């Protein structure tokens, strides 16, 4: 069977770049997990949008008298975390549910957990982090009310992102443990090298059952030289 053509990210045909990944929820993700995986994908999009809003808020912060370094860091976070969050925690989640891969589940938990901690820090809004969180927004009301109101928007969005991330970790962990996942299975996948490109569940089933039955039933043949009916 020919390999599936990559379709993500969708790029205009005039660009010399081509999509890097194949992504189709209905084709690769089991029906019972499609809703959850789609929600994780929407969470990634929501977080990227939050980084974009944060960039605008940091610009308002800078114009109103804040440090320009915050705007520079906000731009860096947007450019860096948009692709990296997709590759580092959404794709492991996608592959984990696609192939029931313990290694990819472990990768998701580790990196997504770090992402959750970072998002909480961004929601708090420590000075010099390039994030318009609560501390930065509330503390700037004495300088510029208009800019502070704009800065409250990413603070709210970062808080919502962190909340949804916490709920997502709990849900995915329950499914993983309920299916019998463990660190030992992840180590086995690492040793066998199947973590690189784990086959889908359908491919695993076909590999298991493909030779168990012939494609067509075997029909017994009888010699024509035997006796005849009277």
Curated annotation (Swiss-Prot):
It is a multi-pass membrane protein. Keywords: Membrane, Phosphoprotein, Protein transport, Transmembrane, Transmembrane helix, Transport. The modification Phosphothreonine is found at residue 194. Disulfide bonds: none annotated. One of its GO terms (biological process) is protein transport. InterPro entries: SCAMP (IPR007273). The chain crosses the membrane at residues 40-60, 61-81, 106-126, 149-169. GO terms for cellular component: membrane. It comes from the Eukaryota. The keyword Transmembrane helix applies. Residues 1-39, 170-230 are cytoplasmic. The keyword Ribonucleoprotein does not apply. It is found in: Membrane. Probably involved in membrane protein trafficking. Belongs to the SCAMP family. PANTHER family: SECRETORY CARRIER-ASSOCIATED MEMBRANE PROTEIN 4, SECRETORY CARRIER-ASSOCIATED MEMBRANE PROTEIN SCAMP. This is Secretory carrier-associated membrane protein 4. The lineage of its organism: Eukaryota, Metazoa, Chordata, Craniata, Vertebrata.
């Amino acid at each position: 069977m020919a390999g599936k053509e990559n379709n993500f990210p969708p790029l205009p045909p005039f660009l010399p770049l081509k999509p890097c990944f194949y992504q189709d929820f209905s084709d690769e993700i089991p029906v019972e997990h499609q809703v959850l995986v789609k929600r994780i994908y929407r969470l990634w999009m929501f977080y990227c949008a939050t980084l974009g809003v944060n960039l605008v808020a940091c610009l308002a912060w800078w114009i109103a008298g804040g440090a320009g370094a915050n705007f520079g860091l906000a731009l860096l976070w947007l450019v860096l975390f948009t692709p990296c969050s997709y590759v580092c925690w959404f794709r492991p989640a996608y592959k984990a549910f696609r192939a029931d891969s313990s290694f990819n589940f472990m990768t998701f938990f580790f990196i997504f957990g770090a992402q959750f901690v970072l998002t909480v820090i961004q929601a708090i809004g420590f000075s010099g982090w390039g994030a318009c969180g609560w501390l930065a927004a509330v503390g700037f009301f004495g300088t510029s009310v208009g800019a502070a109101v704009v800065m409250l928007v990413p603070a709210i969005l970062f808080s919502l992102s962190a909340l949804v991330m916490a709920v997502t970790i709990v849900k995915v962990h329950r499914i993983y443990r309920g299916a019998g996942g463990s660190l030992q299975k992840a180590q086995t996948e690492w040793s066998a090298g199947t973590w690189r490109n784990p086959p889908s569940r359908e491919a695993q089933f076909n590999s298991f059952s493909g030779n168990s039955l012939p494609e067509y039933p075997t029909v017994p043949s009888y010699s024509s030289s035997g006796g005849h009916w009277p």
